Amino acid sequence: MKCEHCTRKECSKKTKTDDQENVSADAPSPAQENGEKGEFHKLADAKIFLSDCLACDSCMTAEEGVQLSQQNAKDFFRVLNLNKKCDTSKHKVLVVSVCPQSLPYFAAKFNLSVTDASRRLCGFLKSLGVHYVFDTTIAADFSILESQKEFVRRYRQHSEEERTLPMLTSACPGWVRYAERVLGRPITAHLCTAKSPQQVMGSLVKDYFARQQNLSPEKIFHVIVAPCYDKKLEALQESLPPALHGSRGADCVLTSGEIAQIMEQGDLSVRDAAVDTLFGDLKEDKVTRHDGASSDGHLAHIFRHAAKELFNEDVEEVTYRALRNKDFQEVTLEKNGEVVLRFAAAYGFRNIQNMILKLKKGKFPFHFVEVLACAGGCLNGRGQAQTPDGHADKALLRQMEGIYADIPVRRPESSAHVQELYQEWLEGINSPKAREVLHTTYQSQERGTHSLDIKW
């Protein structure tokens, strides 16, 4: 992605040299952890990544930079080793939550089926000293269900006076950070308030699971395994609601690639193990996913729900139509010859920028957009889908897409466990506690209007 018209004179990346763009494996730079790496683009006389602009000094505090550098395997092993050395009263309960988009990577990496890859990963982590391994799909259930309700509400309230649409997804931390730090209130007002799956998983582990185990949140060290580096930054910003003790939902985020490096250096002959669930001794034998080609599936599930709730239309197959490119696609619902729902998927910052420009000009006809920072979606996260020299690994991505497509799809509404948790944990589907735990607010910190003049 090229940015040839940036006017950010204060950007510290202008003095950056090519040598400074290299980073160590232990401390990935914020520049490598945000958005598309793609091609270099020019800012004055310096070569920088587009992602540098999105995580420059104006966006990241010194404290965040230090904390981000600690989000690595060393921190994970620090806790594992402390558990082996210190008194049992000081032990941490280690919980690892794995994103479903990471599993195709492990399946491709070790030439296994996705189910066997899940069991191999779980068995390996437990051989290191991890106590519980969870799948974050249940957290995505909550995120999608809350997003469905919010979209229907916004659609019904939308008018010329109260422009609540389009609703833009908020599950991608790279996109959300860009919206908050660069685009500001005109765009953050359109962000869905439902928390991301990672944020919901933090509450599930540190609140619900902790109480089930009679543990304080501080006794749990929660690790997220995710396909992209932006999740590390999300972990720094996410705190549980004050009523839930105010601790961080995720203590450490490791990318799929970082976990694979640990596995390659360890003993892979360990016994496989089934993934744990939040419900006692019950194990998760089957790997399932939501209906998205390479994402958590917000678009498809919200589209079906809205079609039924608003127009009493049952949609079984969601049909995508490519518009500008394969990363900008459209889904529509027609009734009596009129388009009544128009959804889009916008992946990658080039498509995001085009979307924003049209939205600000009032020429954006969509009711809902699934927005992801990475071209190709979550499977193409730079924490797993890249070559050793830092470029996108297209062959690996195609392989992962095939594996992911073969995973059985489940609808969030069909999960009895989710309905149980709404009642047992959140005191009802539309309760004040559900609102507090499952929704968030956004902080607009615009740095200047010139940001929208950038051409990608």
Swiss-Prot record:
GO terms for cellular component: lamin filament; nuclear lamina; nuclear lumen; nucleolus; nucleoplasm. Gene3D superfamilies: 3.40.50.1780, Fe-only Hydrogenase (Larger Subunit), Chain L, domain 3. It is found in: Nucleus. It comes from the Eukaryota. The modification Phosphoserine is found at S29. Coiled coil: none annotated. Keywords: Nucleus, Phosphoprotein. Residues 1-36 are annotated as: Disordered. InterPro entries: Cytosolic_Fe-S_CAF, Fe_hydrogenase, Fe_hydrogenase_lsu_C, Fe_hydrogenase_ssu. Its main location: nucleus. Transmembrane segments: none annotated. Residues 1-19 have a biased composition (Basic and acidic residues). SUPFAM superfamilies: Fe-only hydrogenase. Ubiquitous. Predominantly expressed in skeletal muscle, heart and brain. GO terms for molecular function: lamin binding. PANTHER family: NITRATE, FORMATE, IRON DEHYDROGENASE (PTHR11615). Interacts with LMNA and binds to the farnesylated C-terminal domain. Belongs to the NARF family. This is Nuclear prelamin A recognition factor.
